[in-house]
Amino acid sequence: MRILLIVFLSFFAFSDDHDEMYQPGWAEYVYCNVKEGLSDSKATKMFEKRLAAYAEMAEGLDDEVGMVVLYPYYTNEEMRDGADLFFVRHAPTMKALGEHAMTMFAARQENPLPASPLECDNASTAFQRVGPSSGEVTDSFMVDYYPCKYKEGADPVAMRDAQAKFAMEHYANGAQGGYRYIYPADGSPRGDGPDFWFSGSSPNLATWGESTDIFWDKSYGSEAERARWEHMTCESNSTWYGERVHN
């Protein structure tokens, strides 16, 4: 099962038209494993050196593309799909992603990056609808990812409307974070996979735990919280730790 996930927190002003609170975007996912035969210390040094050089190169570009790296925290083998970690590039449009890739390729040809300790064989894209968050973007974060399917007769707009209402209630109760809907696209698994993924993020492990407590103590069972489940079913989540690489 491919983990089609991303965490890119955005802040939006609340309004009465909840579906307009969602910002569309695109993302590219690259799944990686540490090369065999490398010690942990050697791989870490190579990774840090290459990532720093990559970030410096990417920060020099005048575009709206950013990248994060995610590491497994509460997961199992199926949830990881064999990957040690994965990268996500996020952008407002696929054109922006394509232009970024072309520019970075040309820059790497002129100034090669340090050797990588990773093998990255699988990649995919997804369309996202990013919902309102409780605060600003953070450089590190926790994120839960749920694979979901639509129920028969589901209304996606009504589902997102209920989620937006619930999110505002949850934030008002003291929860911190953001969320988004992720729709698999190019390179995604064929067959009977998820219709979409739902991701919910928190600024750090403490706020992640606090938001979980707030959900069960205060937010669970409200009209908006229950209304979400009229349109979807979701399997158990995986939890990942993320760090921002650039932008």
Question: Where are the regions that the model predicts?
Answer:
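Short, solvent-exposed helix-to-loop capping segments enriched in aromatics
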Residues: 112-113
